[in-house]
UniProtKB/Swiss-Prot annotation:
UniProt function note: Transcription factor that binds to DNA at the consensus sequence 5'-CAG[GC]TG-3'. Positively regulates the determination of retinal ganglion cell fate and formation of the optic nerve and retino-hypothalamic tract. Required for retinal circadian rhythm photoentrainment. Plays a role in brainstem auditory signaling and binaural processing. During retinal neurogenesis, activates its own transcription, as well as the transcription of CHRNB3 and BRN3.
Domain bHLH: residue ranges: 39-91
Origin organism lineage: Eukaryota, Metazoa, Chordata, Craniata, Vertebrata
Protein name, entry field: Transcription factor ATOH7
Gene name of the encoded protein: ATOH7
Single biological process term from Gene Ontology: optic nerve development
């Protein structure tokens, strides 16, 4: 004699229903198995939905801390990961570079050297007023001096 598993006992405990005629039990057992499979599928779907919601929330949080060039569209998951990787690598380079210099002052001087008078005119498209140009000396009384960074 065969025994069927009860649909309300998902723990695997066998019921007291014993089958004498095989066809009645097969129908009942297959129905119970289908109901059990449907319940498991619903539970798995709910777990997957929660997992995806958590993943999407994590991507949204990452998008908020990763710098974006334009705010016109939301970055895709792939773009978000690429930007996060680039951002982390840039920050790592900055930290590694800062460790190479013994003082904070040396690091600041390295990054501010392009602000010296002989080079900042190059960035603005202006030429430096020289002593040989009396017109420039008369018109522009201001003479740029070296920038100083306060400690």
């Amino acid at each position: 004699m065969k025994t069927c598993q009860s649909s309300h006992l998902d723990s695997g405990v066998e019921s007291d229903i014993q089958c004498r005629s095989g066809s009645g039990c097969v129908v009942k057992c297959s129905t119970e198995r289908m109901e059990s499979a449907a319940k498991r599928r619903l539970a798995a779907n709910a777990r997957e939905r929660r997992r995806m919601q958590g993943l999407n929330t994590a991507f949204d949080r990452l998008r908020k801390v990763v710098p974006q060039w334009g705010q016109d569209k939301k970055l895709s998951k792939y773009e978000t990961l690429q930007m996060a990787l680039s951002y982390i690598m840039a920050l790592t380079r900055i930290l590694a570079e800062a460790e190479r210099y013994s003082t904070e002052r040396e690091w600041i001087n390295l990054h501010c050297e392009h602000f010296h008078p002989e080079s900042y005119h190059h960035y603005t498209g202006q030429k430096v007023a020289t002593d040989s140009d009396p017109y420039a000396q008369r018109i522009f009384s201001y003479h740029p001096e070296h920038f100083q960074i306060a400690n």
